[in-house]
Amino acid sequence: MIRFEDVSVTYDGAAEPTVRGVDFTVPEGELVLLVGPSGVGKSTVLGAVSGLVPHFTGGTLRGRVTVAGRDTRTHKPRELADVVGTVGQDPLSHFVTDTVEDELAYGMESLGIAPDVMRRRVEETLDLLGLAELRDRPISTLSGGQQQRVAIGSVLTPHPKVLVLDEPTSALDPAAAEEVLAVLQRLVHDLGTTVLMAEHRLERVVQYADRVALLPAPGAPLTLGTPPEVMAASPVYPPVVDLGRLAGWSPLPLTVRDARRRAGALRERLAATETPTPTATATATAAPAPSPSRPRRPRLLRKRAPVPSAALPVAAVEALAVRRGRVEALRRVDLTASPGEIIALMGRNGAGKSTLLGALVGLVPPAGGSVRVGGAVPHRTAPRDLVRRVGLVPQEPRDLLYADTVAAECVAADGDAGAEPGTCRALVSELLPGVADGTHPRDLSEGQRLALALAVVLTARPPLLLLDEPTRGLDYAAKGRLVTLLRALAADGHAIVLATHDVELAAELAHRVVILAAGEVVADGPTAEVVVASPSFAPQVTKILAPQHWLTVTQVREALA
Ligand SMILES: Nc1ncnc2c1ncn2[C@@H]1O[C@H](COP(=O)(O)OP(=O)(O)OP(=O)(O)O)[C@@H](O)[C@H]1O
Ligand SMILES: Nc1ncnc2c1ncn2[C@@H]1O[C@H](COP(=O)(O)OP(=O)(O)OP(=O)(O)O)[C@@H](O)[C@H]1O
């Protein structure tokens, strides 16, 4: 159904092809997962299927790509639209209409599908993706994950023969990601749909793949195999594979269920070692002294009482209520963050995580209750003063970057922060060695842009650092570097609050997890205790080794050493 014959793509101005000699076939009714480190050309391969490469991106494509027999070089993307549905990395650039319902119908309208069929499919898709309550909402008012659901829904409604998906679950909460993948699998099994999907969070997707295509390094040949074959040698792999390799399991398990069946002996060995402490990973490097009054048990479904802390809190939120349009986005939220503490804010799409971060930087005013950051009330504090107290790296780092070059961005950041000239540039060099002054932020990779936005925010050395979905689009290596950096910042006394759907990141990094549901705090406690209590938010290692309380492969490796 999809066929690559010796394909190379060279972007304009590039000395070398981005991908070369790509040669593989995806038969009808198969789900193939495309994996590899950041920047190896996964999006480029996907773009060659939908025709975006080279028609929209420019550059030269050599060799031949055919989809359902049509050559994508001689057929423009719109001439492929009846067979290929595409979801790109940035849902916002994808939308053509204003409201959820119109967007779901749009693709079908342009293909001339009968009105009664359209109506039925829109209803089905609204239910399938949990969008029914949002059907009349302007898309611009949706949360990041809600937008990603609409983007996926809008390509499903026309029932294309081929789906090309670039990180379709990156903004979805864990339960929604599972639901979307189950829907895709049903389309593949029941309708014979062919799916080619790139994804970094392999723990979410690898078990759904019929085969895995690996681009191991830039310019290296693509290899195709069964998931266990490819995972045995891949430079990117999920925690279940990491644990399997550590324990020497063969064949490698790819699912929690398979790994649990093998884990008996490992559990016994681990039982003889010291049981991990609730914040073992975090305490290994940079935890604040645990305050004796910090709650030891998650307070599921109970209102959290303010806890007096040894260190004066950097942020104190009390009984906060926030309205966004007609929506009560936050209700009765209490939260404190102390110096050196890393807090992961988790919860379903639309639960209010970004809104809470927005309230902490004064972007959204409270409708009730109070927010104090370093003693100031954020929405009443002048930006110049506020940047020295709190900084937010937004879900889309691009939203923070306005200048045409990295150097100009840094000069502006120094000015805004009242910092010594050169402060931001020094941070960029530390975080992003080798990036030239003249580079346009637009041409940076996702991970590089995140690092630049982080440097811009850190220029003012804010005691409170907020990050919204910081691991979107990052590969495991980049995530590892981010973890090291954030731990060092916490050790330096910064309080860090991150909104994330990445349960593996929370397990690795956070001292505390706060779960929001429908605008309210439903759990707040040490990471191990909160995630162990919740199947949705438990990392793979926890599920595999339960009832023991291990969170990460790093902990297990250290215990066995
Ligand atoms: N339109 C373009 N013009 C020039 N260079 C590009 C263009 N699109 C991508 N590139 C470059 O091609 C390389 C591969 O990018 P691509 O987005 O295909 O990688 P990827 O594997 O999808 O990465 P990620 O996992 O970070 O999304 C990168 O170095 C990128 O900078
Ligand atoms: N401008 C707006 N008008 C109306 N409702 C809004 C607006 N902005 C956000 N909302 C709603 O407020 C709720 C909270 O949104 P928020 O972005 O805080 O969620 P989130 O937990 O960060 O979600 P996600 O995980 O999807 O990023 C959602 O139901 C969202 O649709």
From Swiss-Prot:
Q: Which Gene3D superfamilies match?
A: P-loop containing nucleotide triphosphate hydrolases
Q: Which residues does the annotated region (Disordered) include?
A: 268-299
In the bilayer, the protein is annotated as: Peripheral membrane protein
Record's family? Belongs to the ABC transporter superfamily.
Signal sequence coordinates? none
Where along the chain is ATP 1 bound? Answer: G36, P37, S38, G39, V40, G41, K42, S43
User: What's the domain of life for this entry?
Assistant: Bacteria
| CDD domains recorded | ABC_cobalt_CbiO_domain1
Name recorded for this polypeptide: Putative ABC transporter ATP-binding protein SAV_5847
User: PANTHER family, per this entry?
Assistant: ENERGY-COUPLING FACTOR TRANSPORTER ATP-BINDING PROTEIN ECFA2 (PTHR43553:SF27), HEAVY METAL TRANSPORTER (PTHR43553)
A GO MF term: ATP binding
Could you tell me where the Low complexity compositional bias lies?
A: 272-288
* GO cellular component annotations of the record: ATP-binding cassette (ABC) transporter complex
Q: Per the UniProt entry, what species is this protein from, by scientific name?
A: Streptomyces avermitilis (strain ATCC 31267 / DSM 46492 / JCM 5070 / NBRC 14893 / NCIMB 12804 / NRRL 8165 / MA-4680)
Q: Please state where this protein is localized.
A: Cell membrane
Sites binding ATP 2 sit at G347, R348, N349, G350, A351, G352, K353, S354
